[in-house]
Design a protein with these regions (language model features):
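Bacterial N-terminal signal peptides that target proteins for export
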Residues: 1-7
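Bacterial N-terminal signal peptides
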Residues: 8-16
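M14 metallocarboxypeptidase catalytic domain recognition
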Residues: 6, 19-168
């Protein structure tokens, strides 16, 4: 190896070693946001996320078991949520799909899904029937939180959104 290659390696190596020293850590969320997170009027019988965490919601990142624990507890406390475990992660953690709506819509979820499936092929339904189904359906939004295992902010945000939707 010649001197030029050795110098290049030395520079790269010293930069990597010092990069941690040069990077300033970010502030905690309490320093960034003046408004309180989850500051609505909530149903008392539904536990606040802080009940499942060992810190205040928003101060730190919740771990997967805390999120699962909250979801499963909320499914017992509220008739506005249905939890379906659809798979396991590569670490054998449960993966959930949640349906959140009014109690009536949750109890009629199978019919709602059937009506949506009727709309999936325009060749098999006439306009009058399609319009009738559309008029009867609730608004539907698909919200996917964290499709990559190392993206924690989405799953953490889901905790607050779920609570807000079922408890407010």
């Amino acid at each position: 190896m010649n001197i030029k290659n050795l110098l290049t390696l030395a520079i790269v190596f010293s930069t990597v070693l010092n990069s941690e020293i040069l990077i300033e850590p970010t502030s905690y969320s309490k320093d960034l946001y003046a408004a309180k997170i989850l500051s609505s009027t909530y149903i008392d019988s539904i536990d606040h996320p802080n009940e499942f965490l060992d810190f205040n919601y928003g101060d730190r990142v919740a771990n997967p078991s805390q999120i699962s624990n909250a979801i499963l507890n909320w499914s017992q406390q509220s008739n506005r949520i249905k939890v379906v475990e659809y798979a396991k992660s590569h670490e054998n953690r449960p993966l959930y799909a949640l349906f959140i709506s009014s109690a009536d819509n949750i109890s009629n979820l199978d019919q709602i899904k059937e009506n949506i499936s009727q709309l999936s092929d325009a060749r098999k339904i006439n306009d009058q029937k399609a319009n009738s189904i559309i008029d009867s359906l609730p608004a539907i939004a698909w919200m996917a939180y964290s499709i990559h295992g190392n993206e924690t902010s989405g799953a953490d945000a889901a905790l607050g959104i779920i609570y807000h939707l079922i408890a407010s």
